[in-house]
Regions:
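Alpha-helical segment of the N-proximal tetratricopeptide repeat
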Residues: 22-54, 149
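"A position-specific structural signal for the A-helix of alpha-solenoid helical repeats
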Residues: 27-30, 34, 65, 142-152, ...
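Boundary/linker segments of alpha-helical solenoid repeat arrays
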Residues: 60-65, 89-102, 172-185
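Flexible helix-coil transition and linker loops at the boundaries of alpha-helical arrays
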Residues: 20-22, 52, 91-140
Length: 186
């Protein structure tokens, strides 16, 4: 894809000019999604948001990434709305993890798909989530990212009880959420 052209050097599809036109054809939406993830990694919030919006997708990874863009520019109400919408799109709990994904037996994961302890310790000590969500992330990892972002947005909106409820769902193990709860209790 060229910087100004469509996929593989072809012309930009007409549908790309209007996010309301629905999902884009072929590889174009996938390339825009990948470009959005790259922009998120560089904290180029506006460019990332534009890429995700232009895909026309309304799936969980796209909505989460758009929410992360909103969080990056302190638009917490929209961040919260988008991450809640993304959560509703996750597949229901109880469905088996596909082979080859984190948490499946051949990957050495536990039945619940938990990360090994060194990763969990590091994740719990880190601040608010800042990493984009790729497509295909295992459901339990996607849910954790979404809950952590929703807790952070809710805290900044002063929604104390929601933050406490999310902390409990996550086992009260994330430092950035526990810090908010301590601030609320002062």
């Amino acid at each position: 894809m060229g910087l100004l052209g469509g996929p593989k050097g072809g012309p930009e599809p007409a549908a790309a000019k209007s996010p309301a036109a629905g999902p884009l054809p072929g590889d174009w939406a996938g390339e825009l999604f990948a470009a959005g993830v790259t922009c998120l990694c560089c904290e180029a919030w506006g460019e990332a948001y534009a890429c995700f919006a232009e895909t026309g997708r309304r799936d969980a990874p796209t909505l989460y990434n758009m929410a992360l863009c909103c969080f990056g520019v302190a638009w917490y109400e929209e961040c919260h709305r988008l991450v809640c919408e993304a959560e509703r799109m996750l597949p229901p709990d109880g469905e088996p993890q596909p082979k080859g994904t984190l948490g499946s037996a051949e990957q050495g994961g536990s039945p619940g798909g938990e990360l090994p302890e060194p990763f969990r310790r590091r994740e719990a000590a880190d601040g608010p989530p800042r990493c984009p969500m790729p497509g295909g992330l295992p459901r339990n990892r996607a849910r954790t990212l979404m809950l952590r972002l929703r807790a952070e947005a809710a805290a900044r909106l002063g929604r104390r009880e929601e933050v406490r409820a999310i902390a409990a769902l996550l086992g009260n193990r994330y430092g950035h959420i526990e810090t908010w709860i301590k601030k609320f209790d002062r």
